[in-house]
Amino acid sequence: MDFSLSKQDQLFLQMIREFAEKEVKPLAAEVDESERFPMETVQKMAKLGIMGIPFPVEFGGAGGNNILYTMAVEELSRVCATTGVIVSAHTSLCCAPIMEHGTPEQKAKYLPKLTSGEWIGAFGLTEPNAGTDASAQQTFAVKEGDHYVLNGSKIFITNAGYAHVYIIMAMTDKSKGTKGISAFIVEKDFPGFSIGKKEKKMGIRGSATCELIMENCIVPAENLLGQEGKGFGIAMKTLDGGRIGIAYQALGIAQGAMDETVKYVKERKQFGKSLGQFQNTQFQLADLQTKVEAARLLVRQAAYKKDQKVPYSTDAAMAKLFAAETAMEVTTKAVQFHGGYGYTREYPVERMMRDAKITEIYEGTSEVQRMVIAANLLK
């Protein structure tokens, strides 16, 4: 497997790294503290082409591959996990399913505005009674002439309230179970569509996480994504791709925490020498960085397989599982290395620890990833 980037892509990634350091990092603490969606950062990323990295130029994208895209998510998440998840949800959960399952007309209508960053995208699957069990959808859609009428609600939706376009899953035939779920492209201004409660969260606090409400929401029939009854398959395939993005988000958080910790233990002195001179510190850092590098290889392998258009569901699950749990371990130990300072907002590691936790939960909990891996091993 070749994970190398072209010279052009290397320059693009370097630009993203510099942008993250100069434009994103200085805002990270304030965005977290105020729970503010960083729209100014999104607009700057749009101008740089970050909002459409893995999509063809003909549809407004940057023409990159998934390895480049996920490396970009890592760089952003290394300094601000909020920014990383905004890009990941937009790219993997909204743009990607339209690219993979949309009609030529749908692609022409929506992708240029989404991949250019003029519009932000989101994805609506989770419901109050349909979390890990995504098949238990209660939102339903009834076809009436040239449109569908949607009723129901979604919760914990990333980018909600700022997104222009939402991929919504709804039951079109309750008697068929998962084969009765369909996918729809829903615009924010469609009649009957509204934003409900905004969640107050432990981490990624600048990321808008809200409820979606559909009360007799009118959706044109041409906005059916794929065929009726194919929505569950679209959702599962979309989540496979999304898990790679979240794995890279977790990787970025972990690497960011390692960077901060290494800097701290070099400077902090106890008993007449720096913390980094103690063998216990050295051994722990060595183990943690080894896990970070192992996670990096897993997530790059998953991204590579996606680019090669070969099955990658198990790879995505393993990457997300390992990267998320590594991020949680690294950030927890980073706080411990910082001692009392690590528990304060004077240093970013406490924010990183809070941000890391969600990577073990959304787009499939760690338990779900283990189920996916085991099921594919035993089939």
Locate the predicted segments by residue.
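A short core secondary-structure module
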Residues: 146-147, 151-195
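Flexible, glycine-rich active-site loops centered on histidine and acidic residues
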Residues: 95-101, 123, 135
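Conserved hydrophobic/aromatic beta-strand scaffold that supports enzyme active sites
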Residues: 122, 136-140, 147, 165-169, ...
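Flexible, small-/acidic-enriched active-site or ligand-binding loops
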Residues: 136, 191-220
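Short Gly/Pro-enriched turn/cap motifs at secondary-structure boundaries
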Residues: 114, 129-132, 156-159, 173-175, ...
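A short, Trp-centered hydrophobic/proline-enriched beta-strand micro-motif
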Residues: 117-125
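Short glycine/proline-enriched turns and hinge-like loops at secondary-structure junctions
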Residues: 64-65, 133-135, 159-163, 177-180, ...
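Alpha-helical interface subdomain recognition
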Residues: 1-89, 101-106, 113-118, 131-134, ...
